[in-house]
Amino acid sequence: MQRNTVAMKRFGPLFIVVLMLLPFVCRSQTEQTPIRVAFWNMENFFDPFVDSTKTYNAFTEDGMQHWTKTRFYKKRNNMYKAILAMSENHPLGILGMCEVENEYVLSALFEQTPLKKHNYRWVLYEGPDKRGIDPAIVYSLDHFQLVESAVFPYYNPEDTTYHSRDILYAKFVAKVPEPVEGPSHIADTLHVFVNHWPSRYSGELETVGSRSCSAAILRAKVDSIIATAPEGYQPKVIMMGDLNDCPTDPSVYDVLRARHPSEMEEGCLMNLFGKNDGLGFEGTLKHQAEWQIFDQIIVTPAIMEDNVGLHYQEGSARIFHADFMLEDDETYHGKKLFRTYIGPRYFGGFSDHLPVYIDLVR
């Protein structure tokens, strides 16, 4: 009896501390840090060198935009600052990008800045865009293994002379502490599409058909993935990009059939940016006084299910808007984007779009 009393006096405080810490230890074993999946239109992310194989060389030192090495590295540093801030101390799992010229700018951003410690790799195909800018997918090797990738060309049967940017596709398997049972970790397989649909430069109504063509191509590819999936399995597909249309425009709402979760019907895709309810900011770009959401992340309903594998963390869809990416709008009031250029005028900012992201958990 005396021995037990002495033991309690000696180890009692330690025992109490262990009991107090036990809930936190158990929680850390069951909870995982969310994997952030983001998209950002980088706004003319060009290197400063002349490319003799291309006719568009505005973003060179002697070009129309006077794009010097100093300006390029300023842009590069701005972008990594924003990506680090958006990561919130954890590397992004996947970052879809558009308006990327080549692998040189990706290497400068992800291998020559503090981002290099996060073990990023990327997928980039140079396509037919007349300015030489393309979509890219950057992914963390700590989170994902690349299985395959491809591009799907833009095609409009009513105007075969018009060329636009390819849709970029990649298939990933998540790296998880404990493998999921089943072939190829099927519950942790992600199909990712990155889009940059035709712009409204020639007018919204004049170009609506072009964006509808991109929407039809994307929908056909998603339907093919769903149709060829193993029996009983619903594929997890993430579609992201600058669609140059709002969520309620015909290309997105009718052709792609992407709807806000509150408007879902059978056969529809889920647009997590379909309404600005809880997204954290007014829009992803500003036209005069009006904020719009051109940059969207759309998913198949399977990614919303939390019964097995990676799934969407409820309420995590956000428009990222650090204060340093914005400036006062003296013309239309409120805030506007702190851009690199407006026309030929150099301002030394970030982009004409804000990034968007969602979080995945397991």
Stretches with model-predicted labels:
Residues 53-56, 188-209:
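Active-site His/acidic residue clusters
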Residues 44-51, 201-202, 306-308:
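Short, solvent-exposed loop/turn elements at domain surfaces
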